[in-house]
Structures are given as C-alpha cells and as structure tokens.
C-alpha cells in the first residue's frame, strides 16, 4: 500500500477536464532549482534521503517535472505501474532536479512545476478512472501568468485535495469526497491530497489508493473534494468546499484531518515520511509527505495559535458532519484548508524554497507541526488531520483559482468559495502569493493566512464554515465572528464553488468563469456522510446549539399574516435561498447562478429543525419530507417538488411573503375537500329534486366517483337483468336443441323399423311361392340358399316353411337384419323365383 500511496498522481493547476490525462509526471525543479519529488511516496526513508535544502535536489520516489508528454489516465494505471513509475521517477529525479521546470512562473518566481509538485505531492495517488491533465498543462494553465499564479496561489490550483473522508464515493469525480468511516471530513477544495486520518497511513489501504485516483483529478475550486486522498481515512471528507477556501472542504470534522499536501520541501519530504510513520499517531500524511511549515516561515504559525487550537479543538471535539474543521498547524506550514490552498501554493513555492532553505528547519517544522497536531489531536479528535487539511487547501488547483480570478476573487465571487473553504483558510490573492514568493524564507510565522488573526478567524469559521461566505479574509473573519459562527448551520452553507467542478460539457472550464456563475455548494458533498441519518442528527444537534426561536425559524400557517413582512421575507427568503441552493446543488449538479449571500442566522432559519417540527408532526406528515429533516435534500440527492418550488423563490423579491409548502398543501387539501363536499351536496340535491341533471353534476364532479357510482349501479342492474334474460334464452335454446336431437334419433329409428318391415314383407313374399311347393321337396333346394346366404342350418328352412306364416319367421329375418346385404341379395335372388 505504501508504494501505491507513493504513486499517487498529482493533479495539475487548472481543474483537469474529466477524462483528461493524469498528471503523473515528474515535478519540475523547485524555484530554488531543486527538483521537487513526490512526497506522496510512502517510503519515508526515501523521502528523507532525497530531501535536500535550498537548491538541493529533493529526490523523492517521484521527481515532479511537469511534462505534457507524461500524461496518465489515473484510472488506467495499475498500482504496479505506479510503483514502476515511482521508481522511474526516482531515477529521473537526479537529472531533473537541477533542470528548471518548464511550468515555472517567472513573475512570481514560483515554478509551476513546484506547484504542480505540491499538487502532485498532495495528490500522489493510485491512478483512478479520473483523468487529470498533465501536471505541466495544469501548471501552465493555472500559472500561465504571474497574476494568475498569484490568484491561483490563493488556493494552490496545482491540485485539490479530494477528501478521503468520503468513502468509495470519493472515487466519483470527487464531487463527493470519499467517506471515511466514522469521521467525516470536508473535502478540501484546493488541496490536491486528501488527508487521511492520523490513524491511517497513506498506503494503509488500497481503498485510500483508489480514492487518491479521485484525488488526482484536480478540478478548479468548483470541486475540491473531487480530489480525494487515498490516504484519507474514509471519514476524511464531510463535504466539499468552495475552492476559494479549501479549508471548508479541507477541514474535516474535528476528528478528520486531511493530510496536508506539503509543498515539495525537504521538510515536507521529511514530514511526509514522518507523517507516514506517524499517521497512526497525531500526524497525517496525505501522501506520505507533509508540508514543511517552517519552510514557509511557519506560514500558519498563527500568533494566536492557541486560540486557533482552541477553535480546532472545538471543531475536533464537535466535528459537525457538515463542517470540516482543521486546526492551524503550529508548524511553519500550519495552514487551514481554507488558507492552505493559497498556503499550499505558497507552501509549494515558499515551502519548496524554504524546503531548499533548510531541511532542519523543516524538520523542526515537522516536529512543531507534529507536536501541535498531537496537541490538536488531544484537544480535537483528529487535529493532525486538520493540520494536513491545510495542505489540501493549498492544493487548490490553479485552474480553480484562475476561475475565481476570472470572476474576481472579490468577496462576491469568493464568498461562495470561501464560504465553504475559508473556515480555516484565508484566500490568498495573487498579491499574497507574490509576497509569499518574495517571503518564501522571510515569512516565518505568517502562513498563507494573511494574518494569525485571519487564520484564527478562519479557524472559528472552520467551526462554522457554513456561514463563512467571505471571499475576503477580512470577510471570512467577519462571517466567522458573526453569522458565520453558526457552526450547526455551517453545514448548510449556501452553495459554493468548492463542490462545483467544471462540467464535462464546459470543457473543464467553470461556469462561473464562463458566465460569471458561481457554483452553489452544499455544506458537504452529497453522499459524503456515512449515513443521512447521521448527517441529520449531527446537523440537528448543531442547529440546537444555535439560540434561535421558533419565531425566527419558520412561518406558522398564520405567520405570513401575523409576522412582520420584513421578518417573514427575510426568514422565508433566506430559508428558501439556502434550501434552494443546497437542493439545487445536489439536484442540478452543483452549478447554479451565484447564490445570494446568507447570514449565519439565515442558515439557521433555513435548516433549524424548529422550522420543521414546531408545527407538529401532522403538518410534517402532510408537508414535504424536507421540512422534517433539514438535510432531507442532502439525504435524498434528488430534490423534491418542494425544493424545486423553492427555486422559484430565489428570484422572488425580498419583500415578497412566501408561504411554506406545508401551509399551501394544507390549504389546497382543505379547498379540495370543501369543493368535493359541495359537489356531493349538489348531486344529492339534484337527486332529491328528481332532475335528470345528475349527469351534469357528475360532469362537474369528475373527481368524485359517487355520481358515477349511482349510474354504475343502475347500469349494473340492467346488465344483470340482461344477463339473466340471456341465460334463460340460452336454457330455452338448449332445451330446443335437446328436443331436436331426440327427434332426430327417433326419426332414425322409425326409418329402420320401416325398412325392417319392408324386408320382412319381402321375405314373406318370396316365401309365398314356397308354400305352393311341398316343404319336403323344397327343403333341399331352399336350404342351400338359407345356408349360403343366411347361414342358417339346413334344418331351419323346413322349419321356416312350416312357420312361414308366423311372426316367428319374421323375427329371424329381423335377427338377420344386421346382415342386410346378404338378405337383400337373397331377396333379390328370390324375387325372380
């Protein structure tokens, strides 16, 4: 398994189109000139041995030189092939280490190869069915320009981490991270490598390797979860997050830490080896290599690390299924998934540089990160996972960042992405990337997060990622402190780009890039949770944590009239908007028009169980199932008509008062019942009046079968009568038939009798002359005839002669009647005599 995990391919910058080539090419040399090799190799010894500091060759099991020629179908390669490739890359590493990577960016000084390397590092995975464009193409597309690079730096577009938290489902196009057993992690949007639970090593299971294949598919921020680390435990992905903030996706629930894809740094390599060793401990190695945080100047070393830890601890202690929290890493690259995507880019850039800077510093970072992660693990269930989640965040594919750049990483654009991603990660703008590139080694404490405060806020957001819709880091902080603090509802975050991935039809481009549309992501990728029940329970529990009153949650049947229009409008619209977004995301493939930004309370209104339950189960039974469960739409990926109806509400003006579906249904049912009753009464009146307008009434009451029933009764009676008559007729006919048959039989008998009589007469006639002849004389002559023709003994003829006048003679003739032929012959013969 280790080898398989080592073979994890890295996804490239722009989200590769589905069905594209895998990016399993060697990384380009690091900006320092060192060739970045995959840290994903489970062989920590190799990683450590190859790790070198500034400018030194990092000869990992795989050197990452982005080559367009090296394109692999993730799904097509076997683990053995991966191992072979890995060994081959190891061989190639030394010559390639010093060769500049073709994908390097001059403007930012960050080489696309490095980013690709980090991408690959995070995404070392056994090839899966998913295809990833070659790392070079990804790097070129994502990093085609320094400005793009900076933008991409925000979430390392090189790769997005698919979140192994989702289990086998992660093998889907990473829309849904793999479910990890038990722990649910949000797939990191920007992280190429999913982080496996600390208890699992990168190579621990072939399932993880399989999930890595999904991870290999690095899409733009649209679906960070699309890339799933094979290394991630099945619980790694709770839901995908927008790629602007990979943290939300990257943030697994507190228990789930996605191994952070470390920029190709010696520290990273060392950490990856350490993490692969420590995976079961506090550290997770997404690909056997962790991001060296020291190299990044401890980019994530937040000044308020303890606060972040507390937040992480809270998250880990309370990892809502819908929200993925990852603790800031005390280590240099402690980057939350939200910030890590940029951090990942920076980490790759800075991390590679810093990895080149000093492996001992990286080792220290690893140690710090490990200790911090251990602390986090103690504090939170899987802080190490969270720590590594930050790497996944960094792994955001450049294309996704570029997509966000196209739409502008402004708050409006990135809110959706960040809402899902930014819980722990601050979006890194190209400026930040540039600064980070400049400060690869100069920035010791500041991570990709713009500030510790920001990262701290991001962490708090991670707790309540749902409401973290801030495209700007400051916004993230605002949302985090404000409505975004709605951790229970965080899961209901309005759709964000993280779940959205370039559609096949869009040719790998993001719709929001093309049309300015923002993908609406739900809190978690559909199917990311082990069970819908679990999700619902967790969400409900989280929702309960919010201090919302029934009045705030939902409209009663009378609420539209009683409640102020403002409240009603806000509550209803927000509710519908959130629900609609979530539903639309699940129903429509995650691509929606840019969703309206919601406040945390709006989310509460949307998802709070009070909305659904305070009316009473009777209403719920009549109402749509969605009301019964805030996650109903998530649980059943297909949207109900109610959800579809809610979609219409999105465009409704804010001042419009909307009735909830249950109320409408009740009203409709009541109206229908009243109408039916009225029609029945009318029909009855007509019947009593004796007016023959029953048919008219019946026509007016097509829904009520009773009028038809009356007619049917009459018709049935008529039919029965007809049937009875027919039966009688049939009986009569049968009797006639029998009589006729009897008559026919009788006629036949009469004819036979007449024939017999005729024959008898003939016999008598023929015998008359014999009377004239003495019997003695005639006996000899007649006996032959009798004997020959009638077979009678010769003695009979004399007897016959004597009794010729008696009937006894006729009886014998009749007895011989069965032989009419002979008798006829005799008669014929006798006639002449």
Swiss-Prot record:
Query: Where is it mainly found?
Result: cytoplasm
Task: From the UniProt entry, list the residue stretches annotated as the region Disordered.
Answer: 178-208, 321-345, 424-452, 478-508, 602-631, 789-833
Which spans does this entry mark as compositional bias, Polar residues? 191-208, 803-814
Basic residues composition-biased segments: 606-615
What keywords are assigned to this protein? Coiled coil, Cytoplasm, Cytoskeleton, Phosphoprotein
> Where found in the cell?
Cytoplasm, Cytoskeleton
Gene Ontology cellular-component annotations: cytoplasm; microtubule cytoskeleton
- Highest taxon listed in the record's lineage: Eukaryota
For this chain, one GO molecular function annotation is: microtubule binding
Identify residues that carry Phosphoserine: 222, 451
What biological process terms from GO does the record include? microtubule bundle formation
Report the coiled-coil segments: 711-747
Q: In which tissues is it expressed?
A: Expressed in brain (at protein level).
Q: Which cysteines are joined by disulfide bonds?
A: none
* Composition bias, Low complexity: 496-506
Question: Has UniProt tagged this entry with the keyword Glycoprotein?
Answer: no
UniProt xrefs under InterPro entries:
CCSER
State the family it belongs to: Belongs to the CCSER family.
Q: Tell me which PANTHER family the record gives.
A: SERINE-RICH COILED-COIL DOMAIN-CONTAINING PROTEIN 2 (PTHR22461:SF2), SERINE-RICH COILED-COIL DOMAIN-CONTAINING PROTEIN 2-RELATED (PTHR22461)
Its annotated function is as follows: Microtubule-binding protein which might play a role in microtubule bundling.
Q: Specify the protein name.
A: Serine-rich coiled-coil domain-containing protein 2
Naturally occurring in which organism (per UniProt): Mus musculus (Mouse)
- Source taxonomy lineage? Eukaryota, Metazoa, Chordata, Craniata, Vertebrata
């Amino acid at each position: 398994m280790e080898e398989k995990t080592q073979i994890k391919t890295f996804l490239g910058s722009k989200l590769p189109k589905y069905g594209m080539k895998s990016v399993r090419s060697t990384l380009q040399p690091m900006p320092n000139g060192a060739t970045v090799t995959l840290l994903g190799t489970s062989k920590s010894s190799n990683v450590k041995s190859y790790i070198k500091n500034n400018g030194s060759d990092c000869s990992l099991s795989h050197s990452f030189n982005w080559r367009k020629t090296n394109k692999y179908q993730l799904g097509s390669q076997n683990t053995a092939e991966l191992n072979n490739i890995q060994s081959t890359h190891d061989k190639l590493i030394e010559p390639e280490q010093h060769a500049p990577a073709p994908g390097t960016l001059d403007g930012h000084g960050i080489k696309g190869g490095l980013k690709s390397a980090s991408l690959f590092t995070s995404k070392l995975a056994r090839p899966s069915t998913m295809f990833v464009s070659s790392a070079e193409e990804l790097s070129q597309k994502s990093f085609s320009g320094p400005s793009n690079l900076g933008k991409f730096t925000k979430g390392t577009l090189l790769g997005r981490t698919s979140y192994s938290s989702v289990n086998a489902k992660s093998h889907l196009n990473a829309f849904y991270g793999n479910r990890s057993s038990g722990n649910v992690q949000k797939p990191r949007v920007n992280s190429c490598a999913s982080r496996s639970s600390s208890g699992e090593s990168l190579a621990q299971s072939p399932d993880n390797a399989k999930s890595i294949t999904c991870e290999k598919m690095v899409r733009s921020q649209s679906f960070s979860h699309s890339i799933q680390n094979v290394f991630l435990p099945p619980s790694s992905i709770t839901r995908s997050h927008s790629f602007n903030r990979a943290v939300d996706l990257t943030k697994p629930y507190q228990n789930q830490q996605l191994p952070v894809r470390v920029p190709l740094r010696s520290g990273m390599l060392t950490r990856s080896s350490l993490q692969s060793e420590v995976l079961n401990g506090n550290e997770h190695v997404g690909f056997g290599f962790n991001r060296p945080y020291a190299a990044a100047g401890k980019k994530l070393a937040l000044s308020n690390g303890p606060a972040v830890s507390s937040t992480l601890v809270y998250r880990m202690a309370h990892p809502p299924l819908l929200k993925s929290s990852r603790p800031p890493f005390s280590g240099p690259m402690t980057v939350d998934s939200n910030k890590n995507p940029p951090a990942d880019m920076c980490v790759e850039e800075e991390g590679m540089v810093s990895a080149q800077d000093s492996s001992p510093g990286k080792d220290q970072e690893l140690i710090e990160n490990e200790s911090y992660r251990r602390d986090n693990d103690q504090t939170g269930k899987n802080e190490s996972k969270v720590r590594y989640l930050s790497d996944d965040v960094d792994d955001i594919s450049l294309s996704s960042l570029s997509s966000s750049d196209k739409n502008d990483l402004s708050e409006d654009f990135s809110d959706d992405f960040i809402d899902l991603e930014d819980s722990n990660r601050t979006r890194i703008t190209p400026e930040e990337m540039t600064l980070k590139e400049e400060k690869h080694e100069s920035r010791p404490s500041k991570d990709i997060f713009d500030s510790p405060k920001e990262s701290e806020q991001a962490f708090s957001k991670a707790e309540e990622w749902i409401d973290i819709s801030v495209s700007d880091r400051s916004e993230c902080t605002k949302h985090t402190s404000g409505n975004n603090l709605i951790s229970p509802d965080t899961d209901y975050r309005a759709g964000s780009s993280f779940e959205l991935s370039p559609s096949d039809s869009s040719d790998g481009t993001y719709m929001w890039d093309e049309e300015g549309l923002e993908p609406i992501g739900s809190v978690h990728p559909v199917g990311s949770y082990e069970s819908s029940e679990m999700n619902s329970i967790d969400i409900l529990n989280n929702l309960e944590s919010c201090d919302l009153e029934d009045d705030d949650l939902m409209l009663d049947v009378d609420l539209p009239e009683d409640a102020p229009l403002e409240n009603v409008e806000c509550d209803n619209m927000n509710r519908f908007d959130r629900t609609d977004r979530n539903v639309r995301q699940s129903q429509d493939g995650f691509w929606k028009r840019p969703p309206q930004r919601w406040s945390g309370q709006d989310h509460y209104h949307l998802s709070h169980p009070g909305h659904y339950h305070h009316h009473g189960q009777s209403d719920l039974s009549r109402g749509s199932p969605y009301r019964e469960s805030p996650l109903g739409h998530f649980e059943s990926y297909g949207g109900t008509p109610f959800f579809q109806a809610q979609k219409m509400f999105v465009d409704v003006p804010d001042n419009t008062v909307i009735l909830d579906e249950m109320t409408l249904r009740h009203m409709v049912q009541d109206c229908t019942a009243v109408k039916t009753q009225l029609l029945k009464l009318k029909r009855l009146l007509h019947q009593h009046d004796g007016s023959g307008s029953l048919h008219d009434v019946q026509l007016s009451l097509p829904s009520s079968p009773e009028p038809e029933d009356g007619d049917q009764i009459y018709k049935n009676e008529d039919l029965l009568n007809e049937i009875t008559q027919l039966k009688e007729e049939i009986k009569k006919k049968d009797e006639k038939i029998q009589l006729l048959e009897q008559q026919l039989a009788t006629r036949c008998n009469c004819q036979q009798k007449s024939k017999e009589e005729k024959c008898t007469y003939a016999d008598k006639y023929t015998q008359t002359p014999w009377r004239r002849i003495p019997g003695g004389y005639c006996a000899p002559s007649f006996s032959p005839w009798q004997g020959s023709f009638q077979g009678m003994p010769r003695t009979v003829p004399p007897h016959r002669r004597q009794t010729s006048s008696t009937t006894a003679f006729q009886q014998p003739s009749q007895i011989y009647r069965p032989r009419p032929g002979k008798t006829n012959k005799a008669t014929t013969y006798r006639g002449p005599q």
